[in-house]
Design a protein with these regions (language model features):
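N-terminal accessory regions of nucleic-acid-interacting proteins
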Residues: 54-56, 78-79
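Short N-terminal helix-initiation segments at or just after the protein's N-terminus
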Residues: 59-66, 122, 159
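Cytosolic-side transmembrane helix boundary signature
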Residues: 61-95
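Hydrophobic core of alpha-helical transmembrane segments in multi-pass integral membrane proteins
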Residues: 20-22, 46-48, 64-73, 95-103
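Alpha-helical cap/lid subdomain in secreted, periplasmic
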Residues: 5-53, 62, 84-90, 144-145, ...
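Short, charged beta->alpha transition segments
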Residues: 72, 108-110, 201-202
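Serine-esterase "nucleophile elbow" of acetyl-processing enzymes
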Residues: 100-158, 162, 166-173
Length: 286
């Protein structure tokens, strides 16, 4: 996978942007060269954060923009006041700290919910199903390692709406459901409101069946805040454990892990099976 795509889709640009903006907190002289460097760091940081479209609260983006403008005013006036500069730095610091509080929980691996019945149901697209009939997929590899039934309902080309079809006539009561859907919605033309509606209905049905639900967070291209926000808000509403997108990207990124930059090779299936075995172990080891 292209390193730039990985950097953006994995949300790494958000954290690098925060690091660049944190340079504004370092007290420096009023020399023009120092102010120019800090201004460049500010603009670069804002651009990286903007293209990441991290689904953090809108008020945070607004607050960061206001704090950044105030910093520029406080430091670019001919006779800057120490009080203004101090207030500008405090405003930037509040934005950075609140970003850590709001976003860090989505960057760490959640605890897997323990289902009533030790059965894993997988709703997924071709990333899981594979492109060829003879592909030895990660669910098949996982099934050989754990002493629990695995029902792999994945199929090529599936979108979130297809998840509703997958679970028809399937006994879901009290089972653990893993969702790896949405990538084809992003690559296709599914509007954000339709994505929200379909995912809402899918999660509603799963929680009504008393399922424990886990979902892969979608690695997003720039400027898809709407899809990212819809996924996070619905997962919060239905108490769905969201696996940070970095973990899925680790199975995709790297030489030899995919056959076409999107679909897993044998090596990619092995790595994802290794991760899922470790992650799901608490649900299977009662």
């Amino acid at each position: 996978m292209n390193p730039l795509i990985l950097f953006l889709a994995g949300g790494y640009s958000f954290w690098v942007g925060l690091m660049l903006i944190s340079a504004l907190l370092i007290p420096t002289s009023q020399r023009p060269s120092s102010l120019i460097l800090k201004s460049l760091a500010l603009f670069a940081g804002l651009i990286l954060i903007a293209v990441s479209m991290t689904p953090i609260a809108i008020w945070w983006y607004a607050g960061l923009l206001v704090a950044s403008i105030y910093w520029l005013i406080a430091y670019r006036t001919k006779q800057p006041l120490a009080e203004r500069q101090s207030l500008a730095r405090r405003g930037i610091a509040v934005c950075l700290l609140s970003a850590l509080v709001l976003e860090w929980p989505y960057a760490v691996l959640p605890k897997v919910p323990v289902p009533e019945h030790r059965t894993l149901v997988i709703l997924a697209d071709s990333l899981t199903a594979g492109l060829e009939e003879n592909d030895f997929t990660w669910p098949e590899r996982l099934a050989e390692r754990v002493d629990s039934p695995i029902e792999d309902l994945s199929h090529v080309g599936a979108v979130v709406k297809d998840g509703l079809t997958m679970i028809e006539n399937v006994d879901l009561d009290g089972k653990l459901v893993l969702i790896e859907l949405g990538g084809n919605d992003l690559l296709g033309s599914t509007p954000a409101d339709e994505f929200h509606r379909n995912l809402n209905e899918l999660l509603q049905r799963l929680t009504a069946a008393d399922c424990a639900v886990v979902m892969f967070e979608l690695p997003l291209p720039p400027f898809r805040y709407d899809i990212a926000y819809a996924q996070r808000s619905l997962c919060n509403r239905y108490d769905v454990s969201l696996i940070p997108k970095q973990y899925l990207l680790r199975a995709i990124a790297g030489e030899g892990k995919t056959v076409d930059s999107l679909h897993l090779s044998e090596q990619g299936h092995v790595q994802l099976a290794d991760f899922m075995e470790s992650f799901l172990q608490p649900a299977f080891s009662r």
